[in-house]
């Protein structure tokens, strides 16, 4: 698949046996595009990200990005995480506890200098000398995002990137990511449990249920939400 920037984006077919079901998902994401993965807890969303990152290995299928295969089961090809050119913001953040915020970002930089600019872009430049345990969960989340972007990835994988952020900082990060995408053609695959975000987002949304793409699941959630908003209150008004 080829995006508007003239470079091939992500095309993958992931099949992986899990404890209670088999993940079987076709996924595409063009350069400069964001794809949201949503669905009930335990439906295979994080496993999908881990397979794309190379941390988990699919039982069968393929992962193709930027004109090359990262994984191809039929030939046994499997490129490791360090050679995929990806950024991965996991729920655990992945910051080094003995390093300052700035040192964590600098560690991921391909070129010397520039860590402060990343931190300033997400509003935490004043925390650059703090260590992860000295800042809040939302601040750690933003520091980890900077770390993920510092290596200038071609594909960014985000697992609940806004979960610890307030509304103001969510908007700040969304605008920052949009600017990065516009400048670089970065492809983003993001997991969200925020139903409102999934239902109102302008980007493409894939709902997963028991490892399968489930567009009906998202429509059921939309219908339930609308029904709740239309339900009469005790005073006779609607929500």
Per-region residue spans from a language model:
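A short, proline-enriched helix->beta-strand linker immediately N-terminal to the Walker B motif
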Residues: 150-154
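ABC ATPase NBD coupling module
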Residues: 70-88
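Conserved ABC ATPase signature
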Residues: 131-135, 139-141
């Amino acid at each position: 698949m080829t995006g508007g920037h003239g470079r091939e984006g992500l095309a993958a077919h992931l099949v992986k046996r899990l404890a209670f079901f088999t993940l079987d998902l076709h996924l595409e994401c063009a350069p400069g595009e964001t794809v949201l993965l949503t669905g009930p807890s335990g439906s295979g969303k994080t496993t999908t990200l881990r397979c794309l990152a190379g941390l988990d290995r699919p039982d069968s299928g393929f992962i193709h990005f930027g004109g090359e295969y990262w994984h191809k089961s039929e030939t046994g090809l499997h490129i490791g995480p360090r050679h995929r050119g990806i950024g991965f913001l996991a729920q655990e953040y992945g910051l080094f506890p003995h390093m300052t915020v700035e040192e964590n970002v600098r560690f991921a930089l391909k070129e010397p200098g520039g860590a402060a600019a990343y931190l300033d872009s997400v509003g935490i430049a004043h925390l650059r000398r703090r260590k992860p345990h000295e800042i809040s969960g939302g601040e750690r989340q933003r520091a980890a995002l900077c770390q993920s972007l510092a290596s200038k990835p071609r594909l960014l994988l985000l697992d609940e990137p806004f979960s610890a952020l307030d509304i103001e900082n969510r908007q700040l990060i969304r605008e920052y990511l949009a600017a990065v995408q516009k400048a670089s053609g970065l492809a983003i695959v993001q997991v969200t449990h925020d139903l409102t975000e999934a239902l109102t987002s302008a980007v493409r949304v894939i709902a997963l249920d028991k490892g399968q793409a489930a567009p009906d699941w998202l429509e059921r959630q939309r219908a339930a939400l609308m029904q709740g908003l239309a339900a009469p209150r005790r005073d006779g008004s609607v929500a």
